[in-house]
Amino acid sequence: MKKIFLGSLLILLAGYANAQINNPVKWTYTAKKIADKTYELHMTATIDGNWHLYAQDAGEGPEPTTFTFTANPLIKFDGKIKEVGKLEKSYDKNFKSVSKYYGNKVDFVQKVKVKSSIATVVKGTVNFMVCNDRQCLPPRDVPFTINVGGK
């Protein structure tokens, strides 16, 4: 009985550890009002340990971080997405090229204007890839929703 219990416990712990390794990026999404009917959308990635997330202009080889937004007639996008964080640029052994990426944390900021005073949402998907010194995980698509406007 003890062997079965210990075996089950080890399998559960290994599965938990593997799940943590396979999801080294946590995303948060917020909207910050900066003027009347004008907001900044903050799509913030917190990156675990020695992993790094590639920039929107990642360089040759790695999959860059991209955002795709669902059309919303109440939202007008103003400019390009800005990256706020410590951008690193170095030779990437995984791709044998110079790459641009972020470790620890990066905030992707998109300015939007709301065409009405009623609350609405911005929906989209972020596609990203993470690597460490030994391996890369396949690119992932993560859908998100950000509440914007209203009172």
Each language-model region and where it sits:
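Sec-dependent N-terminal signal peptides
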Residues: 4-13
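Extracellular/lumen-exposed scaffold segments
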Residues: 18-151
